[in-house]
Amino acid sequence: MSEAQPLVTPKPKKSVALSGVTAGNTALCTVGRTGNDLHYRGYDILDIAETCEFEEIAHLLVHGKLPTKSELAAYKAKLKSLRGLPANVKAALEWVPASAHPMDVMRTGVSVLGTVLPEKEDHNTPGARDIADRLMASLGSMLLYWYHYSHNGRRIEVETDDDSIGGHFLHLLHGEKPSALWERAMNTSLNLYAEHEFNASTFTARVIAGTGSDMYSSISGAIGALRGPKHGGANEVAFEIQKRYDNPDEAQADITRRVENKEVVIGFGHPVYTTGDPRNQVIKEVAKKLSKDAGSMKMFDIAEALETVMWDIKKMFPNLDWFSAVSYHMMGVPTAMFTALFVIARTSGWAAHIIEQRIDNKIIRQSANYTGPENLKFVPLKDRK
């Protein structure tokens, strides 16, 4: 367990709207209270990221506690049973063109599932948790059923016997069970992405939930928010930056020139963390292990070289997205699916926040600072020029 550090109050960032504003209460997560820490329901991310399976973290967030050995076995069996897709959902996914972004596919899949298996009108908590479990179990099925059908006309079987959500995703993607290293790497990355307090997509989910809307609508809205390159899409952009270079020296020279020209480099800095992203040290080690296992250090070395330059020149640290891009690439995940994996993980956090917002039972309605014109004289339509 990490030692307690003094709490800090980060300065609001001009580039982030509402930075530093407290918008509500949560018992789910704390971010950056000492500058570089992250806790899920009181547990330090550095204690659980590599030691827990993703299903343990999902149980912690959605069901309120870390499971016992028997509870975990039962939970994994439940999730495994929820991987299948209703025929209507498959039919809808077959209409989505191959050119669609995976995030749009997942948003569509969630919406269709919400019409086929709608939430009960009373929005009871056990039912909400069941929906969250079904979504975490089947989001990979939705994406990869669409992917194989739209790209090569294959209707794949999505119900595999893989032990984990991450293993299930990789199995459907590649058509074979992943190695233990890949499955462990996927578990760790999903753990790191699972929850992050009042970020844009989570707050979107809470705003929707606060209106009394259903779980599917709240999750769909969150997916829409996460799709943006300033939020979840950052890991895709990060890899596009990394892959344009052939070697670390070329990367360092070019990025130095770009930074000097005031270009923003996606994958560095964070709206809340002030001294570093605690998730980076974990995912960087994952990326390194995967690269060594593949016998190809090129992308890792380039990413690390860029990390050094950004710190030396700008004193900016990499966030989770930077080395997760390398990790997913080394496991053969298409770049456009990077953020989709984020969705699978973050659904656990979103669902927990939706349930928490429902318990609070208040609509979220903030005020705006008006900056428009005042006291204009009305001109009837016939007199306007």
Swiss-Prot record:
Cellular component terms per the entry's GO annotation: cytoplasm
Residues engaged in binding substrate: 78, 196, 279, 346, 365
One of the Pfam families matching this protein, by short name: Citrate_synt
Pathway given in the UniProt record: Organic acid metabolism; propanoate degradation; Carbohydrate metabolism; tricarboxylic acid cycle; isocitrate from oxaloacetate: step 1/2
Induction: By propionate.
EC number, UniProt record: 2.3.3.5, 2.3.3.16
Gene3D superfamilies: Citrate Synthase, domain 1, Cytochrome P450-Terp, domain 2
Top enzyme class: transferase
Chain sites annotated for binding CoA: 264-268
Keyword Transcription regulation assigned: no
Location of the active site: 231, 270, 321
Keyword Phosphoprotein carried by entry: no
Alphabetized GO MF terms: 2-methylcitrate synthase activity; citrate (Si)-synthase activity; citrate synthase activity
Assembly: Homodimer.
UniProt xrefs under NCBIfam families: cit_synth_II, PRK12351.1
Full protein name: 2-methylcitrate synthase
